[in-house]
């Protein structure tokens, strides 16, 4: 499989796609699930409930946010791979996290949920043919391909892993 061309996604997604050098995106999705599964052993209880600044998310909230994004983006990939031309709305992650109870859920439970979501999504991506990978649709007012969505899913997790490592002094990989 090839990487998505820049015309397959909007500029806001470039930073995520750029974090994914792999060409076998299904393998990258799969391997990432195994890496995510090890996170709870790498984060102390004190760190999982700590935010590095006011109005910033705790590691628990970050992982909850990753589950929200996993759900939204896989739904987009499903709709587009089935040639559904209905424009899909964007979503604002800040009110999603604010409306959740992620801050009160142990990291281990949140990670288990994220891993379960990713593993449930993998069969969809494994079955896609080239026509489905190349299918496009509208989401958040931008044209995006199914292929780009998969790359964004992996890159988005990597983006947050980088932030957890830099701002929380955690070793996630």
Model-derived features: positions:
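A glycine-rich, hydrophobic loop/mini-helix early in the fold
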Residues: 29-57
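Short amphipathic alpha-helical segments at helix-loop
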Residues: 17-21, 58, 99-106, 141-145
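Generic secondary-structure transition motif, activating predominantly at the C-termini of alpha-helices
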Residues: 17-21, 33, 44, 81, ...
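Amphipathic, non-membrane alpha-helical segments in soluble helical-bundle scaffolds
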Residues: 22-30, 56, 60-63, 107-111, ...
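Short, charged, low-complexity loops and linkers
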Residues: 11-27
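Short, contiguous alpha-helical
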Residues: 1-8, 12-15, 48-93, 119-123, ...
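Acidic/histidine-rich alpha-helical segments that form the ligand environment
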Residues: 28-39, 95-134, 153
């Amino acid at each position: 499989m090839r990487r998505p061309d820049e015309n397959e996604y909007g500029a806001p997604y470039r930073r995520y796609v750029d974090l994914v050098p792999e060409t076998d995106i299904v393998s990258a999705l799969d391997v990432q699930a195994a890496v995510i599964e090890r996170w709870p052993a790498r984060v102390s209880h004190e760190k999982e409930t700590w935010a590095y600044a006011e109005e910033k998310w705790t590691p628990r909230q970050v992982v909850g946010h990753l589950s929200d994004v996993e759900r939204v983006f896989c739904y987009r990939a499903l709709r587009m791979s089935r040639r559904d031309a209905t424009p899909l709305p964007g979503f604002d992650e800040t009110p999603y996290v604010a409306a959740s109870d992620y801050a009160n859920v142990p990291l281990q439970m949140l990670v288990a949920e994220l891993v379960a979501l990713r593993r449930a999504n993998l069969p969809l991506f494994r079955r896609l043919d080239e026509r489905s990978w190349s299918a496009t649709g509208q989401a958040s007012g931008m044209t995006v391909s199914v292929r780009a969505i998969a790359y964004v899913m992996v890159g988005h997790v990597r983006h947050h892993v980088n932030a957890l490592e830099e701002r929380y002094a955690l070793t996630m990989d």
